[in-house]
Amino acid sequence: MRLVIARCSVDYVGRLTAHLPSAVRLVLVKADGSVSIHADGRAYKPLNWMSPPCVIAEESGVWRVTNKAAEQLVITLEEILHDSSHELGVDPGLRKDGVEAHLQVLLADRPDAIAPGLTLIRREYETGIGPVDLLCRDSDGSTVAVEIKRKGEIDGVEQLTRYLVRLDADPALPHPVRGILAAQSITPQARLLAADRGLGCAVVDYDELRGLEPSIPTLF
């Protein structure tokens, strides 16, 4: 991970345009290729970001970060206050809470509760940056990665997106790999981001699954 604290301005050019005027900010460049711009506020939320895969071109005082859709973050560095890189290694990830862990077991047994025709290939399929909860096959024979959450939020969409980048590079799998976020509830923001990323969402009923009753998911 690279940490850069700098006085900078940031311009986003894509489906719309956005400008952050000059200020001191933290620029995070992660090993997965993502770049995010942070202020000293907003908790964990960045002011702007670019999800992987993307290409970073460093010129004299200017970074150009371009994703596969040709959207760009242009970071103009006026003064660098700190610049360091750190090897964090492979993170073991958060342990799932009891409900999420049980949901994974139940949905592994009944993947068709996520989407009709879905069958399980493997639980906890390793991606190199953490295991995706379920690796499945749909009725068309395509590979589907399922990430399971108690509540589906933007973080879950981002996590699934990172996994898909790795899975699409896995020579052992048929490509492309499709992604579905499965949860008891999914926020509107997460639904919107998932749709933008080409991901599916499935709302599943934990109580019905525990009772072995038919579960009717909502697909988006």
Curated annotation (Swiss-Prot):
<protein>
    <recommendedName>
        <fullName>Endonuclease NucS</fullName>
        <ecNumber>3.1.-.-</ecNumber>
    </recommendedName>
</protein>
<dbReference type="GO" id="GO:0000014">
    <property type="term" value="F:single-stranded DNA endodeoxyribonuclease activity"/>
</dbReference>
<dbReference type="InterPro" id="IPR049173">
    <property type="entry name" value="NucS_N_sf"/>
</dbReference>
<dbReference type="GO" id="GO:0003677">
    <property type="term" value="F:DNA binding"/>
</dbReference>
<keyword id="KW-0255">Endonuclease</keyword>
<dbReference type="GO" id="GO:0005737">
    <property type="term" value="C:cytoplasm"/>
</dbReference>
<keyword id="KW-0238">DNA-binding</keyword>
<dbReference type="InterPro" id="IPR002793">
    <property type="entry name" value="Endonuclease_NucS"/>
</dbReference>
<dbReference type="InterPro" id="IPR011856">
    <property type="entry name" value="tRNA_endonuc-like_dom_sf"/>
</dbReference>
<dbReference type="Pfam" id="PF21003">
    <property type="entry name" value="NucS_N"/>
</dbReference>
<dbReference type="Pfam" id="PF01939">
    <property type="entry name" value="NucS_C"/>
</dbReference>
<dbReference type="InterPro" id="IPR048302">
    <property type="entry name" value="NucS_N"/>
</dbReference>
<dbReference type="InterPro" id="IPR048301">
    <property type="entry name" value="NucS_C"/>
</dbReference>
<keyword id="KW-0963">Cytoplasm</keyword>
<comment type="function">
    <text>Cleaves both 3' and 5' ssDNA extremities of branched DNA structures.</text>
</comment>
<keyword id="KW-0540">Nuclease</keyword>
<comment type="similarity">
    <text>Belongs to the NucS endonuclease family.</text>
</comment>
<keyword id="KW-0378">Hydrolase</keyword>
